[in-house]
Amino acid sequence: MAQHHNTALRRQIGNRLRDLRVQAGITSQEKLAFSAGVHRTALGRLERGESGVTIEVLAAVLAPLEISLAAFFQPFQSMMLSAAPRRRR
């Protein structure tokens, strides 16, 4: 179950990143990857949800889009809270 949740979260992160890139008028993954200092194939895998991402890499990719980490993750807040392990009493 945790594996399925991780895969779903990676896909949602990738979809959000792709949407923000397109909204910013950057139609080419290659342009964003170059601006962020990451390889285009790594960005492609990230957008497709095929790989996880570190906070450092995500921040680098978001910088050319002028999006903060807080703004990026804001739509995921309720999802992350519901996925948090609950303490036993």
List the predicted regions and their residue ranges.
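Short, charged recognition helix plus adjacent turn
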Residues: 2-3, 63, 73-89
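Basic, helix-initiating cap at the start of DNA-binding domains
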Residues: 3-16
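Short amphipathic helical patch at the helix-1/turn junction of helix-turn-helix
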Residues: 11, 22-23, 52
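Short basic helix-loop element that most often maps to the first helix and adjoining turn
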Residues: 15-34
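Conserved hydrophobic/aromatic packing and binding residues within compact polymer-binding modules
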Residues: 17, 32, 43-46, 72
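Helix-turn-helix DNA-binding elements, focusing on the entry/boundary residues of the two helices
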Residues: 17, 28-29, 40, 55-58
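Recognition helix of helix-turn-helix/homeodomain-like DNA-binding domains
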Residues: 36-53
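DNA major-groove recognition helix of helix-turn-helix/homeodomain DNA-binding modules
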Residues: 54-71
